[in-house]
Structure formats: C-alpha cells, structure tokens
From Swiss-Prot:
Protein name as it appears in the record: ATP synthase subunit alpha
Source organism phylogeny: Bacteria, Bacillati, Chloroflexota, Chloroflexia, Chloroflexales
Main location per the UniProt record: membrane
Compartments, record wording: Cell membrane
Xref: InterPro entries: ATP_synth_asu-like_sf, ATP_synth_asu_C, ATP_synth_asu_C_sf, ATP_synth_F1_a_nt-bd_dom, ATP_synth_F1_asu, ATPase_a/bsu_AS, ATPase_F1/V1/A1_a/bsu_N, ATPase_F1/V1/A1_a/bsu_N_sf
Function: Produces ATP from ADP in the presence of a proton gradient across the membrane. The alpha chain is a regulatory subunit.
Residues reported in the UniProt entry to bind ATP: G177, D178, R179, Q180, T181, G182, K183, T184
Entry keyword annotation includes Ion transport: yes
Membrane topology: Peripheral membrane protein
EC number: 7.1.2.2
Gene from which the chain derives: atpA
Subunit note: F-type ATPases have 2 components, CF(1) - the catalytic core - and CF(0) - the membrane proton channel. CF(1) has five subunits: alpha(3), beta(3), gamma(1), delta(1), epsilon(1). CF(0) has four main subunits: a(1), b(1), b'(1) and c(9-12).
UniProt entry tagged with the keyword Cell membrane: yes
Length: 527
C-alpha cells in the first residue's frame, strides 16, 4: 500500500478545513473487552461509565457498522454490558467507547404507520424514518402534581368491557389469561376501534413469532388501523437484550404523543394507547439478561428488581392536567398465565401495579363465550368515572347480575327444581350473556351498546328465544340507525339528560320488538 506524502496529507487537511470538518480533538473514554459471550461483554477501563450508559463497539475488519451495548453492571474493576445486536463479531481485546448518553429512540410524526425494531430502526421496507426528534427510553414517570384524575373513556368497541370493566384515558388495565384465550384479540379490537377517536396506538410485540407479528400487521392494515398505529417488534428470534428494551422504547414513543402531540387526519392528537404483548415474555428476557450478568437470582430465578422492572414502565402511563397539555398515555399490558394461576409471581406483581384487570378464562372460551371474560375477578379501579352518563346508567346493575347469573347457573346444574324467581334470573342471564357475545374485528359503537344493554337489563328480551338474540341485535341496530339516528347522536355526544332513558329509546325498542315478533312468528310459550 502506497504511503501518503507530506504534501498529500497537507492537501487533505486543507480540504477538510474548507468543508467545515470539526478538527477539534475529542476526549473519549476507551475500554477493552476482557470477556464476551451470550450477548454480554465484560469491559475494563471504563471507570467513568454511568449506569445504563450507551457503549459503542466501533467498526473493525469484518464489521462496517458500530455495535452498541448498555452498561448494566458497574463493578469495581470492570463494567458488564448487554449487547444490542450481533455480538458474534465482538472479540476479546476489542475497543469499546463510552458515549456519555443513555440509549434513545426516534419519536414523533414520522413513526406513525411504521414497523420498527426495539432501537427504532425501520423493518417494514418503507425506507428510513425522517425525524430529528429522539427520546431516551428510560425516564422518571410524571409526578403527582402533573397528573389529572382519569375521567374520559377509551372506547374499546367490546360491549362486555365498555359496560362492566370500563377503561379510561391514562389508565393501566391488565389483560390476563392462559394462552389461546383471546388476549391479543381484545387488544387488536381496541386498536381497530380507535379509528376516528383521536388516539395514536402503539403495539409492542415482545418475544412473539415473526409470522404472528406479520399477521397482526396485516390485520391492522386491512382495517385501516395502521394509519394511526406504530408497531414495535422484538421477536423471539432477537436477543433477550432487545426484548428487554422494547417496551421502554414503545413507551418513549407514546410519551412524545402525550406531551407534544402529533397530527392525525388534520387535527392534533395528544392521546396514546400502548399495548405490551406480553410482559410475561419481557420478564423472562430480563431474567435471562440478569442471570448472564451474574446477578443473584430470587423467586423463580427472577432477579430482585423484577417488580421495579414493570412498575417503572407502567407508572409512565398517565393523564396530564391542562397545565401540562392535557395529553394521556393509556397502557394495556398483557400477561400469560399457566393453568389459570393468577397467583403466580409475575401475574400478582403486575396486578398490583395496574388499575384493574380483564381476566379471560379458557373454559368460557371453549364454551363459545367470546370475549371469554370472567366477570367475577375482572375489575376496573377507575369504574364509572370513565363512562358516559348513558352507559353508566345501563351498566350499573349489569356486572352484579352477570356475576350472580354465573353462580346460579353453576348451582342449577345440581338442582332438580328451581323456583320461578331463580329460573327467571337464569333465563335473563342467558340472554344477557348472548348480548355480550361479540365476534372478533367487529367493534360496536357506544350508542348501539347502550341501546341493546338497556333492552336486555329491562326485560325486553325475555320473550326472545336465545338463538334469536343475535338476529334481534342486528335488526335493532339497523332500525335505530334508520328510524332514530338522533338518539344515537345524543348518546354518542353524551347529551342525554339525567332522566335516561329517553322515551324515544323505550318506544323504539318496543316498536322493533313488536315487528320482530310478527316477522319471526314466535311467542313467549315457544321461548
């Protein structure tokens, strides 16, 4: 290789000065890798490193791009870091540079409609993300003074949830259940229902199969939900380190929406909904990272700070008061249980952190009751504060009635004869159960939920055969949309007075029921 002459070096220096290259010397703390394996590197010489500082493994022969890591263990004579990316090219003796900053991800308008990895890098083939706005993934949660009580509903479009376990903007509501009980389906339906509601959605996939993530992205595209959604994917094939930071990266993107807003359909939006799917796999990834870092294991081999792992994440969900912009970040964490055991370590941790839980049960799912909601142990600690006046008035008794119906139905299996009151209660419960059934990807508007619940609770469906409830629902909704659109608008705008229900709703249901009986040719005796 030819050696550059003094003249050539001088010319290069002049050219650099003309082009404005910064020739000022920079002081960089440099360390050396003394041990590496399984995505963890021990580094000597970085005595000045901060906790959670971003470290750079610079390019070398065989690696054109730098690899980054996060310093997690600060020991007496070394630093242990998890490596974000391909660690196979890192060897003993490699140089490591301190960056003096914590890991940040791109945020803001440019991410809407994109699929990114845990570092905020695009993985959807739509080109680079054009943004100059970055946020650190870790941040202290908003303080008490900056918050406002939760009082605005997040309409999930799922009648069983909106009526009995209402979710408010700024709430943390856990979705918990065994595998294959419809947890992700509830979250995806909620995202689909936010179309036109002024909400940005963030879906964080942690440790899932790539095929499953691709299927979810296709569903969001099909229903037009990707236009206001960000997907953050750290799949099962990626390192435990990336799965560990993925929810924090998604949360940083949501906080940008909450605090500074983005434009959706020509208007500013400051409300965000984030789904963590799921935090069981997140805890497993953190356990793997901690064991590789030689941290002492505790219960079920999880490290001692596994509670703080999730509490510092979920506490960042908030409703800000008007002085701080009035935005909100609503969190829907998902936890997978084993054999319906909600008293295991991670489930109890997350239940105690969140503001309620939606418990989905395998037996109900297999019985065809979908969503498979167990009313008895599902709860929202925000309650009626996050409901409109009309929904609150029809759903006050619903949860108690449904819980009592489940108990009576279980008792009735062993009883030979039942008194008339108990039989009537069971029959009404069966009809309400049919009302609460809902197919996937078919969110129900608020006004339709209120009307059908009012009909069910007040006995208008008592004479309708159970197998005709679905048909009656569809025809009632069509009738209300065509004959009484003003009632639906009043419910949606929350303009009904305290004398709910309005006479129009009663007369509409009675007229529809009369027509339905004539068309269907059934009587109370046939029911």
């Amino acid at each position: 290789m030819a050696v550059a002459t003094t003249e050539e070096l001088y010319q290069r220096l002049l050219r650099s000065i003309r082009e404005g290259v910064d020739l000022q010397p920079k002081m960089v703390n440099v360390g050396t890798v003394i041990q590496v394996g399984d995505g963890v590197a021990r580094i000597s010489g970085l005595e000045q490193a901060m906790a959670s500082e971003l470290l750079e493994f610079p390019p070398k022969a065989g690696r054109s791009e730098p690899v980054y890591g996060i310093a997690l263990n600060l020991e007496k004579d070394s630093v242990s870091a998890i490596i974000l990316g391909d660690y196979l090219g890192i060897e003993e003796g490699d140089q490591v540079n301190s960056t003096g900053r914590v890991i940040s991800v791109p945020v803001g308008q440019a991410l809407i409609g994109r699929v990114v990895n845990a570092l905020g890098q695009p993985i959807d083939g739509k080109g680079p993300i054009q943004t100059t706005t970055y946020r650190p993934i870790e941040r202290i949660a908003p303080g008490v003074i900056t918050r406002k009580s939760v009082d605005t509903p997040v309409q999930t479009g799922i009648i069983a949830i909106d009526s009995m376990i209402p979710i408010g903007r700024g709430q943390r509501e856990l979705i918990i259940g065994d595998r294959q009980t419809g947890k992700t389906a509830v979250a995806i339906d909620t995202i689909i229902n936010q179309k036109g509601q002024g909400m940005v959605c963030i879906y964080v996939a942690i440790g899932q199969k790539r095929a499953q993530v691709a299927q979810i992205i296709n569903i969001l595209e099909k229903y037009g939900a990707l236009d206001y959604t960000i997907v953050v994917a750290a799949t099962a094939s990626e390192s435990a380190a990336l799965q560990y930071i993925a929810p924090y990266a998604g949360c940083a993107m949501g906080e940008e929406v909450m605090e500074n807003g983005v434009m959706i359909d020509g208007r500013e939006v400051r409300d965000a909904l984030i789904v963590y799917d799921d935090l069981s796999k997140h805890a497993t990834a953190y356990r793997q990272v901690s064991l590789l870092l030689r941290r002492p294991p505790g219960r079920e081999a999880y490290p001692g700070d596994v509670f703080y792992l999730h509490s510092r994440l979920l506490e960042r969900a908030a409703r800000l008061n008007e002085d701080y912009g009035g935005g909100s970040l609503t969190a829907l964490p998902i936890i997978e249980t084993q054999a319906n055991d909600v008293s295991a370590y991670i489930p109890t941790n997350v239940i105690s952190i969140t503001d309620g839980q939606i418990y989905l049960e395998t037996d109900l799912f297999n019985a065809g009751i979908r969503p498979a909601l167990n009313v008895g142990i599902s709860v929202s600690r925000v309650g009626g504060a996050a409901q409109t006046r009309a929904m609150r008035s029809v759903s006050d008794r619903l949860k108690i009635d449904m819980a009592q119906f489940r108990d009576l139905a279980a008792f009735a299996q062993f009883a030979s004869d039942l008194d008339a009151t108990t039989r009537a209660q069971i029959e009404r419960g069966q009809r309400l159960q049919e009302v609460l059934k809902q197919p996937q990807f078919q969110p129900m508007p608020l006004e339709e939920q209120v009307v059908i619940l009012f009909a069910g609770i007040n006995g208008y469906l008592d004479d309708v055969p159970i197998n005709q409830i679905g048909r009656f629902k569809a025809e009632l909704f069509t009738y209300m949309r065509t004959a009484h659109p003003e009632v639906g608008k009043m419910i949606y705008d929350n303009r009904l007075d305290r004398k709910f229900p309005s006479p129009e709703i009663r007369s509409a249901i009675e007229n529809m029921l009369k027509e339905f009986k004539q068309m269907s040719d059934f009587s109370a005796e046939q029911a």
